[in-house]
Amino acid sequence: MSDNDTIVAQATPPGRGGVGILRISGFKAREVAETVLGKLPKPRYADYLPFKDADGSVLDQGIALWFPGPNSFTGEDVLELQGHGGPVILDLLLKRILTIPGLRIARPGEFSERAFLNDKLDLAQAEAIADLIDASSEQAARSALNSLQGAFSARVNHLVEALTHLRIYVEAAIDFPDEEIDFLSDGKIEAQLNDVMADLDAVRAEARQGSLLREGMKVVIAGRPNAGKSSLLNALAGREAAIVTDIAGTTRDVLREHIHIDGMPLHIIDTAGLREASDEVERIGIERAWQEIEQADRVLFMVDGTTTDAVDPAEIWPEFIARLPAKLPITVVRNKADITGETLGMSEVNGHALIRLSARTGEGVDVLRNHLKQSMGFDTNMEGGFLARRRHLQALEQAAEHLQQGKAQLLGAWAGELLAEELRLAQQNLSEITGEFTSDDLLGRIFSSFCIGK
């Protein structure tokens, strides 16, 4: 397998459909056109032609599009064949194309990878293609499109350019100490560094929003049996996702629902009631419940309000609270307010949010929805926003740490070489986002998660 091979893949989803598309990229795409179509179509014009087998018989007929490189998605010669979407027809056409020497099936994401390697896209834009395909809401799709069009990359490149100018100034002062460049008296370096750090903080804040929009928040509903966990899942989901009975321990396994609150994706997980297991099936369900709790972004501690008047989670169930991960945020949900007559709404107890509601009637559930949105700092007005991945957040955080360390050098003993090194490392972290400095292993992991024909 060589990166110089001409590659082919189906660009439409597998299965039956009105249209099926095969995409070919590489220097032999021209030969494919001449062999299968009998001619080379006019560049960037749709041509309706028969697709022929080796013996001259017609396999299908459809539209052929020819994009000679470098003016194509991948930067190479690209041919697209748009025929009927039957799997048998597409398979016959694909087999015909693969009889031509030098062609092979594309790896997942290889078309986008070639676009990146040929400077048609930077890495953040290439990732945005997959994010746009996987978008689960209108807001996520718009933000992914913004990233694909370069919104995120432009912000990162602006930071990289600012760091370049700052490094030039610092390193000139180090290399030419006899020149009249005084770091401390004019304050230029500190002022420029503060500007870069402020811009970086703004990008980090937007990236956290973009990551939340892409990844969603994992919320686990946990508590004793018959506290109303499954009823709350149904209320949040707006449908009967879980079986609800008066029998304690009805839920034996993990149930998952994917919902949106004003565009924010939420992964709601209902778990088995926590108690001493009565049988092996329940024991496994409780083990899985704790596994989900340990991986949660937030736990909704469900309390049956008819069984206790306590509101402090440490008082309600100290053993449960003691077992939770130290920094895991919890929200206490006192359920069955329709029976207890408690006042609906939210308050705070010892640093924990406390919400009184009725999962059965739905009263107070909107308060919980707003709380979940606000607890993650989600901004529903993200016009011009972009999507971000975990690796982007890590790169931005590392860049911020290097700038903080560089500023400490500047304001402390003034070690010019150490400041210059911190600036270089921060610039490298930022450049990893767009792919200016990226290892081959990382590229492989990123593009292998793409669709085959992308």
Swiss-Prot record:
* Domain called TrmE-type G: residue spans: 216-377
Where does the chain bind Mg(2+)?
A: S230, T251
For binding GTP, which residues are annotated in this chain's numbering?
Answer: 226-231, 245-251, 270-273, 335-338, 358-360
Its cellular-component GO annotations read: cytosol
Q: Per the UniProt record, which EC number(s) apply here?
A: 3.6.-.-
Is GTP-binding included in the keywords of this UniProt record? yes
Q: Where in the cell is it found?
A: Cytoplasm
**Keywords linked to the UniProt accession:** Cytoplasm, GTP-binding, Hydrolase, Magnesium, Metal-binding, Nucleotide-binding, Potassium, tRNA processing
Q: Does the keyword tRNA processing apply?
A: yes
What's an example Gene Ontology biological process for this entry? Answer: tRNA wobble uridine modification
UniProt: (6S)-5-formyl-5,6,7,8-tetrahydrofolate binding residues: R23, E80, K120, K454
> Cross-referenced CDD domains, in alphabetical order?
trmE (cd04164), TrmE_N (cd14858)
Q: How does it assemble?
A: Homodimer. Heterotetramer of two MnmE and two MnmG subunits.
Q: Which family does it belong to?
A: Belongs to the TRAFAC class TrmE-Era-EngA-EngB-Septin-like GTPase superfamily. TrmE GTPase family.
What name is this protein filed under?
tRNA modification GTPase MnmE
The record lists the organism as Shigella flexneri
